[in-house]
Amino acid sequence: MKSLILLAILAALAVVTLCYESHESMESYELNPFINRRNANTFISPQQRWRAKVQERIRERSKPVHELNREACDDYRLCERYAMVYGYNAAYNRYFRKRRGTK
């Protein structure tokens, strides 16, 4: 019984020390931390937005070979299942690479 009371007291002390609400947890005094779209769009200028879109298009055009192989494998269900077990490289080699001796 004494150990149960001691355990309850230790648990209560742990709750008090760990759940203490300090001033640091109240750093933001705003009631609503979210902003509307108009104010959110003022952070990035239209020029930066345009530049980001252009860079994204360039990245889409010049994808690495392994990513193109993975996308090809994702479109074919058997290849995708095989890839879940053996990996995308092995699956692509099995289903899409030309076999030796065939033209």
Swiss-Prot record:
Record GO biological process: cartilage condensation; cell differentiation; ossification; regulation of bone mineralization
Disulfide bonds listed in the record: C73-C79
Domain (Gla): residue spans on this chain: 51-97
Keywords: Chondrogenesis, Deafness, Developmental protein, Differentiation, Disulfide bond, Gamma-carboxyglutamic acid, Osteogenesis, Phosphoprotein, Secreted, Signal
Residue(s) carrying Phosphoserine: S22, S25, S28
Post-translational modification: Requires vitamin K-dependent gamma-carboxylation for its function.
Sites bearing 4-carboxyglutamate, chain numbering: E21, E56, E60, E67, E71
Signal peptide: 1-19
Places the protein is found: Secreted
Propeptide segment residues: 97-103
Keyword Cell wall biogenesis/degradation (UniProt): no
PROSITE patterns membership: GLA_1, GLA_2
A GO term for molecular function: extracellular matrix structural constituent
Top-rank taxon: Eukaryota
GO cellular component, one term: extracellular matrix
Phosphoprotein recorded as keyword: yes
Family according to the record: Belongs to the osteocalcin/matrix Gla protein family.
Disease: Keutel syndrome: An autosomal recessive disorder characterized by abnormal cartilage calcification, peripheral pulmonary stenosis neural hearing loss and midfacial hypoplasia.
Function text: Associates with the organic matrix of bone and cartilage. Thought to act as an inhibitor of bone formation.
Protein name, UniProt field: Matrix Gla protein
Species the sequence originates in: Homo sapiens
